[in-house]
Structures are given as C-alpha cells and as structure tokens.
Swiss-Prot record:
GO terms for biological process: sialic acid transport. GO terms for molecular function: pyrimidine nucleotide-sugar transmembrane transporter activity; sialic acid transmembrane transporter activity. Residues 389-405 have a biased composition (Basic and acidic residues). The keyword Transport applies. Residues 61-73, 164-170, 221-243, 302-321 are lumenal. Keywords: Golgi apparatus, Membrane, Sugar transport, Transmembrane, Transmembrane helix, Transport. Residues 385-405 are annotated as: Disordered. It is a multi-pass membrane protein. InterPro entries: Nuc_sug_transpt. Belongs to the nucleotide-sugar transporter family. CMP-Sialate:CMP antiporter (TC 2.A.7.12) subfamily. The keyword Disulfide bond does not apply. This is CMP-sialic acid transporter 3.
Length: 405
C-alpha cells in the first residue's frame, strides 16, 4: 500500500484502502463525483451563508441602545436554540413521513436512544457555541461590525491547525501560505490606532479587546472542528436528528447561563423577553438560520469552506455598516479584503492541493480507468468478470467518511 492506495494481488488494480488516514474521504473523494445540481446547491449555500453571516453584526449593532444592550445576550442565544430545536423537530417529522417501507423508523424510542448515545459528543461543541455566542455580543462593545468580521477570519488558521490534529487533514505549502496571506489581509485592515478610553466593564480598551479576541478566535474554532468530527463520525444518522441533539444541548447550556444570571443579578433578570425589540427578533431568526446552514457545511463539506464562505461576508458587512451607520470604509479595509480574496483563490486552487491528495486522486482515476477497461473485457468473458467482481467484495462504501481511528 502506498499513499493510501492498495493494489489488488489478483488483477493489480488500484483501490482506496479503507484504513488510510492521509486524506479524509469526507473532504476529497466525494468531490470527484459531485453532480451539477449539487454544485448549484453548494453555491446557493455559500451565498446564503454570506448574507446571513454578514447581516449578523449589523443586526447586533442595531440592537444596541446608547452603546449598550437593554436585553440579556444569553436570552437571545437561548431563544435562538429554541428556534433551531423547533426547526429540527419539524424537519424530522417531515423526513419520517417520507421514509420508505422497511427502513428503520426515525421516531422510534430505540432509534432515538441509540442515536443519543452515539452523538453524545455533540455536547462539547454545544457548550463551546454557547460561550462563543455570548462573546459575539461582547466583541461589539470593542469594534465596529466590519472589524468584528475581519477578526473572526483569524479562526481559519486555528481551524486549520485543529483539523490537522483532530481530523488528520493535510495541507500543502501553498495552502499554508494562503492562510498566512489571510492573516496579512486581516492585519492590513487593523493598521490604525485603537480609540482611547475605558469600556463599560472597566477594563482598558486595548487589554479587553486583545483578551476577547483570543477567546473569540479559539473557542469557536474548537467548536467548529469538534462539531464537524461529531457529525461526520455518525454519518449515517439523520442530520436533523443530530441537530436536535446539538440544539437541545445548546438550549440547556444557555438556560443554565440564564439561571446563573438570575443568581448574580436577582429574579428580575429571569424575564428572557425583557428589552427585546424588532431588531433582536430578526437577530434571533438570523442566528437560527445561520446555525442550521452551518450544520450542512460541517457534515457534507468542511469547516475551511465554511470559514472562507464567512470571509466573503466581510464585504457585505462593511458596505451595510457604512450605509446604515455611517462607518467609513478605509483604504486599509479595501486592501485587506483584496488580500483575503487572493488567499481564498490560492487556497482552493487545484495546484494548491497536498501532494498526497493529488497522487491519491490520480491513482484513483487510474484505477477507475483500469476497472472500466477490465469490465469491458469481462463482457466477452462473463466468467472472468464474475470472478473479478467477487475479488472486490471487500471495498469500502464510498458514502462512509474516512475519519481518524
């Protein structure tokens, strides 16, 4: 076996080894057989993600009154999780009604209990997301919406490191250089002095901003990678059932946060609807739609694509914040965005793929060509074709994602 490709001793054809850990099939192998309809769907998902992610900082900014929030950010996160739970239940009911005869019922108690046990790892990203969602509001106290989006792009580098460690994904030198370009683009946008003064919580602005930035980058990066790992490790489980567990855990953690606020501030803070406005209602719907869309990225695509998709939303955020709130679009911002787009093009370029990935895809296509030629010969000799088919009964299912073991 070489580079994850095994050679059949009987016919010397190339086959993907089910034990290979170099490249995850969830990332690469499915892209070879992507249909035109799925490509269109992926484009629509990216466009929708850009709009939702780009609109979120604007809605958060609109929710502030005199630079402060009259509502509890935890209450917004809790209502968002409740909205996503309702969506998951509705979609699960619809999926159950369209099940074929003989399939294991999705709504049976045994199926639910078994799926809950298999997907208990989703509690980890749910907790991290609960922390991150609160940090999104805190970051708005330090930066304008466009800057928040630029800072969030720092997550890509942290995610890449975590993917290499957790998912065993390999990146080429060109892809690492693309990530470095991304950091340069973000830095160019930040080449201006921070305003002086103190924040509402009494911490010097520079210190508070740096601390929040480190947490704001690290926590959601870990949440995204662990979420992707948990979703892909139970690939055969319905995504709506997995989302039900993920959002259920999230609602529990946010409710515990509300109880903690009640203990700290008193019973008056238990009113989760206090201080909400029309802008916060749109914010809740936007956050819910964004979370639902993210789950499809994590299960059927990958986290890097999701984060680069969110990067494109920076343009929308910058233009919207300038039009609605009068924020100035600086030359640094335009230069930073240009560098970010160059980075994105370089990262996803076919020439930037890791050498092992190129060899695997080339060997896989060569193996498929040999198999096709051999199948044509077996049409003449049916007995030989039957023997050859029997020799490959052990090949793994292409639908099963290859995760580190």
């Amino acid at each position: 076996m070489k580079n994850g490709i095994a050679e059949c001793p009987a016919c010397h054809s190339k086959l993907v080894s089910p034990g290979s850990k170099t490249i995850s099939r969830a990332y690469d192998d499915h892209k070879i057989r992507v249909s035109s309809k799925q490509r269109v769907l992926n484009v629509l998902l990216v466009v929708g993600d850009c709009m939702l992610v780009g609109l979120q900082p604007v809605l958060v900014y609109m929710s502030k009154v005199d630079g402060k929030f009259n509502f509890s950010p935890i209450s917004v996160n809790f209502l968002t999780e409740i909205a996503k739970v309702i969506f998951a239940i509705v979609m699960l009911l619809i999926q159950a009604r369209h099940q074929k005869v003989g399939e294991k019922p999705l709504l049976s108690v045994s199926t639910f209990v078994q799926a809950a046990r298999n997907n208990v790892l989703l509690a980890v990203p749910a907790l991290l997301y609960a922390i991150n969602n609160y940090l999104k509001f805190t970051m708005q106290l330090y930066f304008n919406p466009a800057t928040v989006k630029m800072l969030s792009n720092l997550k890509v580098l942290v995610i890449a490191v975590l993917l290499k460690m957790v998912m065993k994904r390999r990146f080429s030198i060109i892809q690492w250089e693309a990530l470095a370009l991304l950091l340069i683009g973000i830095s160019v946008n930040q080449l201006r002095s921070l305003p002086e003064g103190a924040t509402a919580i009494g911490i010097p602005l520079a210190t508070g901003a740096y601390v929040c930035t480190v947490i704001f980058v690290t926590v959601p990066s870990m949440a995204s990678v662990f979420n992707e790992y948990a979703l892909k490790s139970q690939y055969d489980t319905s995504i709506y059932l997995q989302n039900l567990f993920l959002y259920g855990y999230g609602a529990i953690f946010n409710f515990l946060g509300i109880l903690g606020t009640v203990i700290y501030k008193g019973p008056g803070s238990f009113d989760i609807l206090q201080g909400h406005s029309r802008a916060t209602m749109f914010l809740i719907l936007n956050n819910a739609a964004q979370g639902i869309l993210s789950s499809f990225f994590f299960k059927y695509a990958d986290t890097i694509l999701k984060k680069y998709s969110s990067t494109v939303a920076t343009i929308f955020t910058g233009i919207a914040s300038a039009a609605l709130f009068g924020h100035v679009i600086t030359m640094n911002f335009l230069l930073g965005i240009s560098i970010v787009f160059i980075s994105m093009h370089q990262f996803f370029s076919p020439l930037a793929k890791a050498r092992d990935e190129q060899q695997q895809n080339g060997n896989l296509e060569l193996g498929n060509t040999k198999d096709t030629h051999r199948a044509n010969e077996s049409f003449i000799n049916m007995a030989a074709g039957a023997n050859e088919e029997a020799s490959h009964r052990g090949e793994s299912d292409d639908r099963t994602p290859l995760l580190p073991r």
